């Protein structure tokens, strides 16, 4: 997907990018490749692949109407090089984005990136989701939590649901179908106060399949969750 094909694909969803936004994506690509030589951000560095598998894929929640142009708060868990939240932020500058990442080098990259792209209302937090999930400054405060290829749902839900406001939505972006994952995660979702709402299945322009699971927070998460760092991955709620 060339940059021009990226722009053309967005117009099919009635999204027209300004010159500023086009340049922001271009600079994003340049910085991603430049920093990737110093720290491991992504295995995908070829320009057309970045535009397809990082930029286009990241904005799927916008393309399919799950996130609209409103000043809602989004927490991105394990965003790595800023996916999916920062491409969405470029499209909808009103979004209030917070990113948690456990690697300080990635936070340094994201700090430079957001400054270079002129993105405001982006908060970067260095640490573990399990720790921030017990912090009253962040717990139960977000409209959306996004996570792209971070962990299986049975683990991911413990990382994410505690951060949501009541009626907030977890958007879990997955490459493959997750029926088996969803079955494994039913106990965790219910225990944490969530409810599976629906799955959005779609294809990238090259035919690759993608899926987004929507899980809504229906009631408060018990105080014991998330458990201490490392425990959810080693011992998922069953």
Swiss-Prot record:
Binding locations of S-adenosyl-L-methionine: 78, 83, 129-130, 148
Keywords associated with the record: Cytoplasm, Methyltransferase, rRNA processing, S-adenosyl-L-methionine, Transferase
Name assigned to this protein: Ribosomal RNA small subunit methyltransferase G
Main localization category: cytoplasm
UniProt family annotation: Belongs to the methyltransferase superfamily. RNA methyltransferase RsmG family.
Any one cellular-component term (Gene Ontology): cytosol
Pfam families: GidB
Cystine residue pairs: none
UniProt-listed InterPro entries: rRNA_ssu_MeTfrase_G, SAM-dependent_MTases_sf
Domain of life per record: Bacteria
Example GO molecular function: rRNA (guanine-N7-)-methyltransferase activity
EC number(s) from the headed UniProt entry: 2.1.1.-
Keyword Manganese listed: no
Known role: Specifically methylates the N7 position of a guanine in 16S rRNA.
Region spans: Disordered: 216-238
Compartments (UniProt record): Cytoplasm
Keyword rRNA processing belongs to the record: yes
């Amino acid at each position: 997907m060339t940059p021009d094909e990226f722009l053309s694909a967005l117009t099919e969803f009635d999204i027209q990018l300004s010159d500023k936004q086009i340049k922001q994506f271009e600079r994003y690509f340049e910085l991603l490749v430049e920093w990737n030589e110093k720290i491991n951000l992504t295995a995908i560095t070829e320009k057309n692949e970045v535009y397809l598998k990082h930029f286009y894929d990241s904005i799927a929640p916008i393309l399919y109407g799950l996130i609209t142009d409103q000043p809602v708060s989004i927490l991105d868990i394990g965003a790595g090089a800023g996916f999916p939240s920062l491409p969405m932020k470029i499209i909808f500058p009103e979004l209030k984005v917070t990113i948690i990442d456990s690697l300080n080098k990635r936070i340094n990259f994201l700090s430079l990136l957001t400054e270079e792209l002129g993105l405001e209302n982006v908060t970067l937090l260095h640490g573990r989701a399990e720790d921030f999930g017990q912090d009253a400054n962040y717990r139960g405060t977000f409209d959306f939590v996004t996570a792209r290829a971070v962990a299986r749902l049975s683990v991911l839900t413990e990382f994410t649901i505690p951060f949501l406001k009541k009626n907030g939505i977890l958007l879990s972006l997955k490459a493959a179908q997750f029926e088996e994952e969803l079955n494994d995660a039913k106990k965790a979702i219910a225990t944490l106060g969530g409810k599976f709402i629906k799955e959005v299945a779609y294809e990238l322009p090259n035919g690759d399949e993608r899926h987004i699971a929507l899980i809504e927070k229906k009631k408060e998460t018990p105080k014991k969750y998330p458990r201490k760092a490392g425990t959810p991955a080693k011992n998922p709620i069953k």
